[in-house]
């Protein structure tokens, strides 16, 4: 069976989009394709002017590193690294110099209200603080597109809404933000809702 079937979708720069659907509907697969973590077996996918489906593995890796930041449901933080060290990882991968890394990280941590948590391990932080660390890590490389897979799924309602407000603020700064959620209340906080069922797009609020 196909995870996605006959999906046709265009997302403009600067949109704030929710991809909504039940578990197993194909929404996470769609996010992985958008994020260059998975390749469709048929059809084409363009990111800006690059045809990702025809690009080499190294080109796709470069696109992913330069253009995309990820936020996951269970934070995906390294348990034995401090908050600061977790946020530093993508900058190390990009060979950013130490002094510049420090400047970027501290600026993001201050902006997200987690500067006082910088030397803490993830296990010593609340879920909301851990998700803020994950968001900071997604932002430090100045990615154009932020992808968030169930970013509020492991949080209580109040903290989940705070995280969504943060993503909204990030979107207003000019970044494209795409979230996957099964929560209608969360989806309604975005500007556009795409609904997926059994691998097909069955609703797009932009077309109303």
Regions found by a protein language model. Give the residues of each.
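ABC family nucleotide-binding domain
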Residues: 1-196
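H-loop (His-switch) and adjacent beta-strand-loop-beta switch element
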Residues: 193-205
């Amino acid at each position: 069976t196909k995870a996605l079937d006959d999906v046709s979708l265009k997302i403009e720069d600067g949109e704030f989009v929710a991809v909504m659907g039940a578990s197993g509907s194909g929404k996470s697969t769609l996010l992985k394709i958008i994020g260059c973590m998975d390749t469709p077996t048929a059809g084409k996918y363009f990111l800006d002017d690059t045809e990702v489906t025809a690009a080499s593995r190294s080109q796709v890796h470069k696109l992913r590193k330069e253009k995309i930041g990820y936020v996951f449901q269970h934070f995906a933080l390294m348990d034995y690294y401090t908050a600061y060290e977790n946020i530093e990882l993508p900058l190390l991968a990009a060979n950013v110099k130490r002094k510049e890394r420090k400047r970027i990280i501290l600026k993001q941590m201050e902006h997200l209200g987690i500067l006082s948590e910088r030397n803490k391990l993830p296990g010593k932080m609340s879920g909301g603080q851990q998700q803020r660390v994950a968001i900071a890590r997604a932002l430090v490389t100045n990615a154009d597109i932020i992808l968030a897979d169930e970013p509020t799924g492991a949080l209580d309602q109040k903290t989940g809404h705070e995280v969504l407000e943060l993503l909204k603020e990030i979107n207003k700064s000019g970044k494209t933000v795409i979230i996957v959620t099964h929560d209608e209340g969360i989806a309604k906080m975005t500007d556009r809702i795409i609904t997926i069922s059994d691998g097909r797009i069955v609703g797009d609020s932009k077309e109303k």
